Amino acid sequence: MLGTALRRCAVAAASRAGPRGLQHPAPVPGPTAAIQSIRCYSHGSHETDEEFDARWVTYFNKPDIDAWELRKGMNTLVGYDLVPEPKIIDAALRACRRLNDFASAVRILEVVKDKAGPHKEIYPYVIQELRPTLNELGISTPEELGLDKV
């Protein structure tokens, strides 16, 4: 398997060489070549949407989550090119409540609105789905706080 990966990387390197080929003999692969070849060769499994959602719900449902982990998780989640599902946001809001972090809860809702971008129907749908949770936890939306007018 490692030999196959080394050959693939060598073929890729040779194809990137100029039209006259390599100007000097190719070096013999050393111990670092194995590390590089493994990085060139990736065949990981793809995560389904359900697995993705379950992973993030589990992350935010950790009973011992702290404020730093909450912010780190939200920063990572915001980095993806998607609007999180309401069940993920629900878990994140409940984590905020466990931490008594009202500001982070409101910020999460602001981020969801920002991630929805020009698709004006997404944010109202998310708020509609989260309304029971927001009422239960006593969390106001940015619009209810007047933050959308600032």
UniProtKB/Swiss-Prot annotation:
Pathway: Energy metabolism; oxidative phosphorylation. The modification N6-acetyllysine is found at K87, K113. The modification Phosphothreonine is found at T141. It is a peripheral membrane protein. One of its GO terms (biological process) is mitochondrial electron transport, cytochrome c to oxygen. One of its GO terms (molecular function) is metal ion binding. Residues 1-41 form a transit peptide. It is found in: Mitochondrion inner membrane. A motif (SIFI-degron) lies at residues 2-17. SUPFAM superfamilies: Cytochrome c oxidase subunit E. Pfam families: COX5A. It comes from the Eukaryota. Keywords: Acetylation, Heme, Iron, Membrane, Metal-binding, Mitochondrion, Mitochondrion inner membrane, Phosphoprotein, Transit peptide, Ubl conjugation. In response to mitochondrial stress, the precursor protein is ubiquitinated by the SIFI complex in the cytoplasm before mitochondrial import, leading to its degradation. Within the SIFI complex, UBR4 initiates ubiquitin chain that are further elongated or branched by KCMF1. Its main location: mitochondrion. One of its GO terms (cellular component) is respiratory chain complex IV. Belongs to the cytochrome c oxidase subunit 5A family. Component of the cytochrome c oxidase (complex IV, CIV), a multisubunit enzyme composed of 14 subunits. The complex is composed of a catalytic core of 3 subunits MT-CO1, MT-CO2 and MT-CO3, encoded in the mitochondrial DNA, and 11 supernumerary subunits COX4I, COX5A, COX5B, COX6A, COX6B, COX6C, COX7A, COX7B, COX7C, COX8 and NDUFA4, which are encoded in the nuclear genome. PANTHER family: CYTOCHROME C OXIDASE POLYPEPTIDE, CYTOCHROME C OXIDASE SUBUNIT 5A, MITOCHONDRIAL. Component of the cytochrome c oxidase, the last enzyme in the mitochondrial electron transport chain which drives oxidative phosphorylation. The respiratory chain contains 3 multisubunit complexes succinate dehydrogenase (complex II, CII), ubiquinol-cytochrome c oxidoreductase (cytochrome b-c1 complex, complex III, CIII) and cytochrome c oxidase (complex IV, CIV), that cooperate to transfer electrons derived from NADH and succinate to molecular oxygen, creating an electrochemical gradient over the inner membrane that drives transmembrane transport and the ATP synthase. This is Cytochrome c oxidase subunit 5A, mitochondrial. It comes from Nycticebus coucang (Slow loris).
